[in-house]
Amino acid sequence: MVKNAFISVISQEEKEENKGSAEFQVFNFTNKIRRLTSHLELHRKDYLSQRGLRKILGKRQRLLAYLSKKNKVRYKELISQLDIREPKIR
């Protein structure tokens, strides 16, 4: 896993942003999602972790929707910085 790249980003985020901001929360959820994904590659039948992953994905999706409504520029920057796909519009 690419932990070192995220450590430098998280230290910048902690200095610049509030920990309660939507951007910081999306960043933390993304780290948790990546950790759980690598865990589930080894433990495929860990259904509680799968449920936790789905819950975190939903939370991140709601936060990203909120951020895209409030500030489109910061939303685009965050998605490109974290290398997240943009959700499909229904």
From Swiss-Prot:
SMART domains: Ribosomal_S15. InterPro entries: Ribosomal_uS15, Ribosomal_uS15_bac-type, uS15_NS1_RNA-bd_sf. CDD domains: Ribosomal_S15p_S13e. It is found in: Plastid, Chloroplast. GO terms for molecular function: structural constituent of ribosome. One of its GO terms (biological process) is translation. Gene3D superfamilies: S15/NS1, RNA-binding. The keyword DNA repair does not apply. Pfam families: Ribosomal_S15. Transmembrane segments: none annotated. It comes from the Eukaryota. Keywords: Chloroplast, Plastid, Ribonucleoprotein, Ribosomal protein. GO terms for cellular component: chloroplast; ribonucleoprotein complex; ribosome. PROSITE patterns: RIBOSOMAL_S15 (PS00362). Belongs to the universal ribosomal protein uS15 family. Part of the 30S ribosomal subunit. PANTHER family: RIBOSOMAL PROTEIN S15, BACTERIAL AND ORGANELLAR (PTHR23321), SMALL RIBOSOMAL SUBUNIT PROTEIN US15M (PTHR23321:SF26). This is Small ribosomal subunit protein uS15c. It comes from Platanus occidentalis. The gene is rps15.
